[in-house]
């Protein structure tokens, strides 16, 4: 079988670039990493502003059907937000923390070979304790990355060429700012060429991705440098704004 990487770097969970999918990591996989995030993908321009920021995260697949993650996104001080003094303006002084969870409710091929895998999940569901929380419409309030979803994934194998993954999801939240309420669709292709040359082996580490995340069309790739233990993720959000990061994995089982 083709190895699973699929590290959704902004949320610190398994996924494509921005949209959720139904793929799961190996049982007892510990995943951690960090990323540079473009301002175009950050949910609150009022809170963050127009600058690249950094996140870091840790994630564990506790059971083959359950994944839990914790993500932190750094924030710079700016005038008019949260009583920062002028000497701190433009410096990283805070971080937005969020929890994330994914539950596999149906495994691919359980009933018939054509049935997809199905996952339900949530991002940043209840961490907004300040002034209204995750359901608040004000950009300054917490729950910035809040969304709920159901996702389905189906794989198609092409012998000695690669594996195509087709992904569909419905994404929703109750916020006016960074609002989600619609379908998402995406695909990825991971090569599995015959390992007869250095080039073929190098290409086999590449995972190409494209998606419509219910708000924008994005493209990118993931590259595994050492099996799936060290991976790089690169996204062009709206096919032009760069974000990317490194993902590390430890298999505890």
What annotation goes with each model-predicted range?
Residues 5-148, 153-159, 192-198, 206, ...:
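Transmembrane beta-barrel domains of Gram-negative outer membranes and organellar outer membranes
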Residues 37, 73, 123-125, 169-175, ...:
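Active-site beta-loop-alpha junctions enriched in small/polar residues
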Residues 87, 226, 251-252:
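Flexible, surface-exposed loop regions and adjacent strand-edge segments
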Residues 98-103, 185-187, 238-253:
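Outer-membrane beta-barrel "beta-signal"
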Residues 143, 178-180:
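Short, solvent-exposed loop/turn segments at conserved positions within beta-propeller repeat blades
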Residues 161-169:
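Alpha-helical interaction elements
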Residues 183-235, 245-247:
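Outer membrane beta-barrel transmembrane domains
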């Amino acid at each position: 079988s083709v190895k699973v990487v699929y590290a959704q770097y902004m949320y610190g969970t398994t996924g494509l670039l921005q949209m959720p999918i139904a793929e799961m990591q190996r049982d007892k996989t510990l995943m951690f990493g960090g990323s540079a995030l473009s301002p175009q993908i950050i949910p609150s321009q009022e809170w963050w502003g127009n600058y690249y920021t950094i996140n870091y995260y840790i994630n564990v697949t506790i059971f083959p059907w359950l994944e839990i993650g914790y993500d932190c996104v750094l924030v710079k001080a700016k005038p008019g937000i949260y009583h920062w003094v002028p000497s701190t303006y433009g410096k990283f002084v805070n971080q937005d923390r969020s929890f994330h969870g994914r539950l596999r409710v149906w495994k691919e091929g359980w009933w018939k070979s054509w049935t997809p895998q199905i996952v339900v999940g949530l991002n940043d569901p209840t961490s907004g304790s300040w002034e209204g929380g995750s359901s608040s419409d004000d950009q300054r309030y917490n729950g910035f990355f809040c969304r709920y979803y159901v996702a389905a994934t189906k794989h198609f194998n092409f012998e000695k060429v690669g594996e195509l993954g087709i992904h569909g999801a419905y994404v929703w939240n109750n916020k006016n700012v960074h609002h989600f309420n619609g379908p998402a669709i995406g695909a990825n292709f991971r090569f599995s060429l015959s390992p007869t040359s250095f080039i073929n082996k190098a290409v086999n580490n590449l995972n190409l991705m494209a998606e419509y995340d219910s708000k924008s069309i994005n493209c990118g790739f993931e590259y595994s440098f050492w099996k799936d233990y060290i991976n790089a993720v690169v996204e062009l959000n709206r096919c032009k704004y760069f974000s990317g990061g490194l993902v590390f994995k430890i298999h505890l089982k």
